[in-house]
Curated annotation (Swiss-Prot):
UniProt protein name: mRNA export factor ICP27 homolog
Function summary: Multifunctional regulator of the expression of viral genes that mediates nuclear export of viral intronless mRNAs. This immediate early (EI) protein promotes the nuclear export of viral intronless mRNAs by interacting with mRNAs and host NXF1/TAP.
Major subcellular location class: host cell
Subcellular location(s) per record: Host cytoplasm; Host nucleus
Quaternary data: Homodimer. Homodimerization is required for transactivation. Associates in a complex with RNA, and host export factors NXF1/TAP and ALYREF; these interactions allow nuclear export of viral transcripts. Interacts with three host shuttling SR proteins SRSF1, SRSF3 and SRSF7. Interacts with host SRPK1. Interacts with IE62; this interaction enhances IE62 transactivation.
Amino acid sequence: MASASIPTDPDVSTICEDFMNLLPDEPSDDFALEVTDWANDEAIGSTPGEDSTTSRTVYVERTADTAYNPRYSKRRHGRRESYHHNRPKTLVVVLPDSNHHGGRDVETGYARIERGHRRSSRSYNTQSSRKHRDRSLSNRRRRPTTPPAMTTGERNDQTHDESYRLRFSKRDARRERIRKEYDIPVDRITGRAIEVVSTAGASVTIDSVRHLDETIEKLVVRYATIQEGDSWASGGCFPGIKQNTSWPELMLYGHELYRTFESYKMDSRIARALRERVIRGESLIEALESADELLTWIKMLAAKNLPIYTNNPIVATSKSLLENLKLKLGPFVRCLLLNRDNDLGSRTLPELLRQQRFSDITCITTYMFVMIARIANIVVRGSKFVEYDDISCNVQVLQEYTPGSCLAGVLEALITHQRECGRVECTLSTWAGHLSDARPYGKYFKCSTFNC
């Protein structure tokens, strides 16, 4: 390999890509000296990768740094993260006219840079490495790193000193100026609210608490007397929730329960309040049974061609039931929606409940949430009836639903998902614990085709 020489012709121009990420304030002499050093070391011909390009003669002008456009890495704590890019670099030498040098061709030379060193068969260029080392030391001296953490006493002193109070007053003045400029009202507690909060609880006595308990007890006793009477079914007592009721039995006696809700308006309001109280504290198993109770009730009324009133205790508490199911099955449904194959469907539980599309139904879990969300939305809007078309797209309302499938189907989905997923959140969040102090008020029947 022949040694490269540097011509002194001032017309020679050079465009050089940044090999060593030099600082922008470097003098032109250092830049030209470094390129000259590369030529003298005869390392321009080292090839990157499997390239076999040989070395060429390099021409450098003293003013070549005018075309020098370096690319720098980001600074962190006064030091550079990566001073050199770990990839091959190219030195491009361009002549405005080849006749200035006797028709000689000047071609591109290559150099390989690895971790700040120029690899070649003969030598290394250590000049840039020394510069990087010296600059790093000077940066450490000029730009100290993060100051040491303050002790509790120092932090308290800084909080209570005069400079801190001065900064706080300036910030408060700036906020006040902005508020006046844009006419922003001041957010403050009203005098009436201050008076109410300060005197809260002053009138509570033992007698007033006892009177409240007696009033609630009278309402519960009145409701329990009606629930245990013969008015629930024609010719006998309604089976209740202690034993399972078959679908034919519910079709036989269900209209009597419907008539009871229509006859006792006051007791229906009590039933709604007690049922909502029970539903909000139900466990997962009990919440799934309540979901089956709601959907079975809707299916029975549609089969008998009866109007579905929203003031019915079973229908009126659908919003509380939906909130409890979201709380119990939220992590499981979130993982289920993210991993399903349908890319066009809803990907989150809030999106599923907001859109309430029949096309989002892919399993019994999504079916339960979409149906109950549709019913709850109608109740919240204040409608008097639930239209059949709002809850079913078939001629026979809820034809695809089997009584008891919410409990059996969701438990089956949980078991299958636990085997496939294995996430701890999906398993522990659906732990079916029972509340020992939950009373069965507001629960009217249990109808399930499955033995579970």
